[in-house]
């Protein structure tokens, strides 16, 4: 079973991550299914497209766009699956809807995307910003950046408004496109990665 142009993925667990345990009882924490923060983003690749080449393989764990597994209400108030729905808990997924893939317990970003972790702002004259703007540590790179000797752990600058917030294994990261990385900096030795306390204890990926 293969699609011509799309991956076929299955949610790793459930479509939504919206339940917490309170004194042995399940509490649903979202009030509407439209809130993308509670849509599961973790899937398992069941099939790769026939046309095109990709480093992503069957069996890889992937982080996908929040609309892939999402449900919504149409104009008549009827609950619907997203346009990605295929059948029986399987979903079509475009190549540019996959932001990370995991193989052998290691996360990698596809050619088009990368993830950057912000660093602490140590500027003495600006006290209300906890992280330095437009600069961070490359957390998950790709082969395109490797070709420019920009590898994971590099200190990089990125374009304004290019960052999109994700929580990956208790780390708050910024997803952006490869061409949003604008410069590689030299370390000064005082850089410290910044991760807010709420992210390190959330226990979710979104």
Predicted features by range, described:
Residues 1-206:
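Acidic-enriched and Gly/Ser
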